Regions:
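N-terminal cap/lid segment of alpha/beta-hydrolase-fold proteins
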Residues: 28-60
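Conserved serine/cysteine hydrolase catalytic core
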Residues: 42, 224-290, 295
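Active-site loop/oxyanion-hole signature of alpha/beta-hydrolase fold enzymes
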Residues: 45-49, 56-59, 91, 101-138, ...
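Conserved HGGG/HGGXW glycine-rich cap/lid loop of the alpha/beta-hydrolase fold
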Residues: 47, 51-106
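Gly/Ala-rich beta-loop-alpha elbow adjacent to hydrolase catalytic centers
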Residues: 139, 143, 147
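Flexible "cap/lid" loop of the alpha/beta hydrolase fold
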Residues: 148-152, 161-191
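Catalytic active-site module of serine/aspartate enzymes centered on a nucleophile-bearing elbow/loop
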Residues: 287-328
Length: 328
């Protein structure tokens, strides 16, 4: 009996350890996350701080056409989730530049004032340094807000604006209760791999698949780092940026060819947890927001995907990549 109880105790401990190790501890600059292509760093000095922006610069693999595309990631992501898009674009002759924005991915987690204007400026400087005169700009989620700001500020630099399920199609501050950055920081500190998975399942995807776990492993892995409070503070600062700096009132000012790619089942709302279920049902309805946004942008085209959520390039990669390359 004693041996049996010891065996049970050992089994519980063993499986508990397996569960605890399921999400590895990651550094907040993702030093132990392998990116699909070599990572370089662009030095920046701002607010008296020397910081660095990580980026991948991937050459075309065949039939170089002399054109460039820059990819802007979403708030909960980094350059690591663009692999299939990079391959598709380099295969048709594009040079592809993939930055991790300051505060995200492998870039510095700086305590600064975050703004889409400043981010756009840094990306323009990066492109200038790399000798890029004009580029296709593809932005996903938060990257869609940044891509919009970039196109508004630098239309001469923007060959085409491509928006994949961008956030900011609603003015969140008109219906999401205001909370301070300090309050959002406390919320971010409570993040776990399980809470990340639950949010992704409920907002981002129509049906959860094991291959999506890599997104949770990264977003959840950093929560185990001793430096996670710094990550959480930056996440709170960029939440405030999104909340306070809408771009939707300027869609009509865009002067570049624009295409929206919309997964119609997306229900993303920034600050969703601050709403009741009834309130949530009134917002984040991309099957409506996509068309409404396209109507605001002169000459915009919209490509919608049924049975697809927030990240078409991951959820329906073949269909998305065909639509993407066909829009260039």
């Amino acid at each position: 009996m004693k041996k049996f109880l010891l065996l049970i105790a050992f089994s519980l401990f063993f499986f508990g350890q397996l569960k605890a190790q399921k999400t590895d501890t990651l550094s907040i600059t993702l030093d132990n996350v392998k990116y699909p292509y070599p990572v370089k760093y662009f030095p920046i000095n701002t607010e008296g701080q020397d910081i660095k922006m990580a980026y991948m610069d991937v050459a075309p693999t065949s039939n170089a056409n002399g054109k460039t595309a820059i990819l802007f990631h979403g708030k909960n992501f980094g350059g690591y989730y663009w692999t299939n898009v990079i391959k598709a674009l380099t295969n048709i002759g594009y040079r592809v530049i993939v930055p991790d924005q300051i505060g995200f991915g492998k870039s510095s987690k700086a305590f600064i004032h975050y703004s889409f204007h400043q981010m756009a400026t840094w990306n323009k400087r990066l492109l200038d340094t790399l000798g890029v005169q004009k580029t296709v700009v593809l932005g996903h989620s938060m990257g869609g807000m940044l891509a919009t700001r970039f196109a508004l500020m630098y239309p001469e630099k923007t060959e085409k604006l491509l928006l994949e399920n961008p956030i900011g199609l609603e003015d969140y501050k008109t219906f999401i209760p205001y909370i301070t950055t300090a309050q959002q920081y406390q919320t971010e500190l409570k993040t776990t791999a399980e809470s990340v998975r639950k949010y992704y399942q409920g907002s981002y995807f129509t049906y959860w698949k094991p291959e999506y776990e890599f997104l949770v492993n990264i977003a959840g892995g950093v929560t185990n780092s001793s430096d996670y409070p710094r990550w959480a503070k930056v996440a709170a600062l960029t939440y405030t940026m999104i909340y306070e700096q809408p771009v939707l009132y300027e869609f009509q000012n865009l002067k570049v060819p624009t295409v929206l790619f919309i997964g119609k089942e997306d229900k993303t709302i920034v600050g969703k947890g601050l709403l009741t279920p009834d309130q949530q049902a009134l917002h984040g309805q991309y099957k409506l927001l996509g068309k409404q946004t396209a109507a605001k942008i002169i000459g915009a085209k919209i490509i919608e995907f049924d049975a697809c959520g927030h990240i078409p390039h991951i959820e329906i990669p073949t269909e998305f990549l065909v639509a993407l390359t066909g829009s260039l």
